[in-house]
């Protein structure tokens, strides 16, 4: 069966292919090979630029341009050529080394030093740097922009709904009023912190040989400061240098990154469920798109499908990302191969995350507030004012203030008239009593509006 979006095993390459296209250049097999190519070429150029290595002369501008062109012009057709070589070698990194040698064999300047391609490297020297570059590219070009779009929309809605009062629900029961804008501001603030954590994770790299000790490097050039050279090279790629490794870079930084994404995803999953609940209560309506169908049998339905899709994909993402974070730092002795197949699923976990972000943003764009229903909800729950009334009573020394309000309101519905009749009996200053008599559930929102506008 030919592979296409209808026959793809994973929905990321099938139904949702267009929505995760931004990640394909980073986490596909092509993306991995291209990242490896960049590392191999930059390593060769760095060796040539170091005067200490007299056996490899500095490249001319033309030679450097030819090497850079290999990276710039590398596409799926070139990746297929590498895969064809791998069919013989049964080794992916060695196949790329042979491909580079073949593509540069017509250049006498490069072919003369072709044995410095992949010089002193173990495959993991190339792979760890490639994986870090892939994650960095995806983080900067696709994932952070997607989170920023959600953050921007949440701030926009928080400001728009800053003063629209809403009855809170703690344990699913009526609780102290807030505003819808403040609740969305809560999510925006949490996401801002999670986003900062994602952005702050330093991705590490190493290029220190088979077990991390520069054995082969020092055998070829004894006494040379290979650690300093490796540090400069890794940092030239925009990565942080890890001086202590086994054959693999231990992946602690990748684990930190995936944990950080999982934390952001949990925040957004929480938001998905809350918005779903507000839609269920009728506090939000969803804009209807002509031609769309909500149910195959119930024509009236407008379902919260975007938030449900987001919740499902973020859950899938976290299952994978948490496994990556737990598994990757563990390797038997100086290395085993269990990380290799797991690392190939980085894009799957982050792909489901990106799908979740896309669906959530789409859903947020469809929301319309139902302020009248929210006010009616508050108007039906005047017992919410038990909190401010008993607090003012306590200020003025009224004995058993909490207990008196508990007797009046616990498990009961109390009308406006009932609450005001109770207030009228209180032995508190007349000004305080007047303030309580003016108080309503819809204006008992504290600093909610201010906090929402401030986000």
Language-model segments: which ranges?
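Generic, well-ordered alpha-helical scaffold segments in large soluble proteins
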Residues: 42-47, 99, 103, 153, ...
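Proline-centered turn/helix-capping motifs that create local helix->coil transitions or kinks
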Residues: 104-110, 199-202, 280-283, 318-322, ...
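Short amphipathic alpha-helical segments with heptad-repeat character
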Residues: 136-144, 148, 155, 185-188, ...
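Alpha-helical coiled-coil oligomerization motifs
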Residues: 159-162, 199, 203, 276, ...
